UniProtKB/Swiss-Prot annotation:
It comes from Pseudomonas aeruginosa (strain ATCC 15692 / DSM 22644 / CIP 104116 / JCM 14847 / LMG 12228 / 1C / PRS 101 / PAO1). Its EC number is 2.7.4.33. Has low activity with Co(2+) or Ni(2+). Changing residue 408 to A: Almost loss of activity. Belongs to the polyphosphate kinase 2 (PPK2) family. Class II subfamily. Its cofactor is Mg(2+). Residues 11-234 are annotated as: PPK2 1. Residues 269-495 are annotated as: PPK2 2. This is Polyphosphate:AMP phosphotransferase.
């Protein structure tokens, strides 16, 4: 896989200087067209052998192009803030928006490679990391990102010659770093595992480009031309090709009986039983959150449901048991301009809680397979692939010790109508009823189908859905609290 990058490529000075003039002009033009169209972001991953010119090439790209439209990100040791969250969080929060370019040093490939080379992880863990990287990149590209992956290469002989030359040169010996010497010691293992990573993750939508790094002029021109040709091709394509679904469209149940039809919405708690059970579950929650075992966890609660199903009231009964410093409520509405410039999961990743914290999502990433599906805000291919992307997202949260609980609060049409009318009559509740609520009511059956599909495809052992019978608000509130408490206790038992 690296043979063509060990043959001794070189470019003479005159050829280089002539080519650079045209290349710089074309790159700048493409960069400003990217900004003008603002249809997709560009993500450049920098990997390969230490000393093969990675830093020098990126520095040159910043000189050739407008650095105001480029964000260079270096992922070295995780910060304390990053260590408190799943590993992917640090990458998600630094993704470039549409129209801009992000250059990632020390990205997900660097971390998995060094971890395996240094023996911190086993073969199976490396394979898991490779699979996760491939899924992440597939999603980024499906969301429109243009991804370039560069491997800067030197043969073992070229690396040793470079180290010796720099060591003897008083003016340039400062360029040597401990990583350069370390690379020389582990070269064979690094290249072995590097080849494995490239072989497994070079795809048509995100191929690897192996660049020989010995000659700086050849290296710079090669990278510049790859970027230019890729950018020009993407900019000239008015609509990026989207992956088409391979399965038949989802259909309604043949007997017209859906998952929500199986709920007993007549379940009820009288006032005295409600007060007693509510107080008991709130006290239980307060104790579980204060337990020292919660230091290894955080909590994410997702609230979805029919309009007027009582999500707000249920959330308030949960937070009544907590210190305001422990929780954060994230209300989800239509995405902002900033959020539309990113993959749809970006605005949820940025709110993932640190350890010992509790985040409540009032509406969530499930909008992709509910309102966006029903209103046609995204293509069928997009919401069909979202089921797998959401499962992957929640699995990453769970693997890091985040307890994920998900609620669908269900009411019948008659109860919803009664609550709508009550809201219209009550001045301090009138703000809760909108034209959108009435439009959603007209699409009741479509939501029934969408909710059934959502639960069937995303209710997993690590993040199951809880369907809450919410015609009676008291019953619903207690069930929500009890479910959260049961989930925390189950997580504590697994810790043992």
């Amino acid at each position: 896989m690296f043979e063509s990058a060990e043959v001794g490529h070189s470019i003479d000075k005159d050829t280089y200087e002539k080519a650079v003039i045209e290349l710089r002009e074309a790159l700048l033009e493409a960069q400003f067209e990217l900004k003008q169209q603002a249809r997709f972001p560009v993500i450049i991953l920098i990997n390969g052998i230490e000393g093969a010119g990675k830093g020098e090439t990126v520095k040159l790209l910043n000189e050739w192009m407008d650095p105001r439209l480029i964000e260079v990100q270096s992922f070295l040791r995780p910060s304390d803030e990053e260590l408190e969250r799943p590993p992917q969080w640090r990458f998600w929060r630094r993704l470039p928006p549409k129209g801009r370019t992000g250059i990632f040093f020390g990205n997900w490939y660097s971390q998995m490679l060094y971890a395996r080379v240094e023996g911190h992880i086993k073969e199976a863990k490396l394979d898991q990391a490779i699979d996760a990287a491939e899924r992440f990149e597939r999603m980024l590209c499906d969301e429109g990102a243009l991804l370039f992956k560069f491997w800067f290469h030197l043969s073992k002989k070229q690396l040793k010659e470079r180290l010796k030359a720099l060591e003897k040169d008083p003016q340039h010996s400062w360029k040597l770093s401990p990583l350069d010497w370390k690379q020389s010691e582990v070269y064979d293992r690094f290249v072995h595992y590097g080849e494995r990573v490239l072989r497994r993750t070079s795809r048509d939508y995100a191929p690897w480009y192996v660049v020989e790094g010995a000659d700086e002029r050849y290296r710079a021109l090669t990278v510049g031309r790859i970027l230019l040709e890729g950018l020009q091709a993407a900019l000239a394509t008015k609509e990026r090709a989207k992956r088409q679904p391979h399965a038949a469209p989802l259909v309604s149940s043949l007997d017209n009986r859906g998952l929500l039809d199986s709920l007993d919405l007549g379940q009820y708690l009288d006032k005295d039983a409600y007060k007693e059970q509510l107080a008991a579950e709130q006290a239980r929650l307060a104790g579980l959150i204060r337990d020292k075992r919660f230091r290894q966890h955080s909590l994410v609660a997702v609230f979805e449901g029919n309009d007027a199903a009582g999500k707000g009231g249920a959330i308030r009964r949960v937070t009544d048991a907590l210190d305001p410093r422990q929780y954060h409520i994230v209300p989800i509405a239509a995405p902002t301009e900033e959020e539309r410039a990113q993959p749809y999961l970006w605005r949820f990743w940025r709110h993932i809680p640190a350890r010992r914290q509790f985040t409540i999502f009032d509406r969530s990433w499930y909008g992709r397979v509910l309102v966006e599906r029903i209103e046609g805000f995204c293509a069928p291919a997009d919401w069909l692939r979202a089921y797998g992307e959401i499962n992957d997202f929640e699995e990453q949260l769970s693997e890091y010790g985040i307890i994920v609980v998900k609620f669908w609060l269900a009411i019948d049409k008659q109860t919803q109508m009664e609550r709508f009318k009550e809201r219209e009559k009550t001045p301090y509740k009138r703000y809760k009823i909108t034209e959108e609520d009435w439009r959603n009511r007209d699409k009741w059956d479509q939501y029934v189908d969408a909710v059934g599909d959502m639960v069937d495809r995303t209710s997993t052992e690590i993040a199951p859905w809880t369907l809450v019978e919410a015609n009676d608000k008291r019953f619903a509130r207690v069930k929500v609290l009890r479910t959260i408490n049961d989930a925390i206790e189950a997580a504590y038992k697994k810790d043992k």
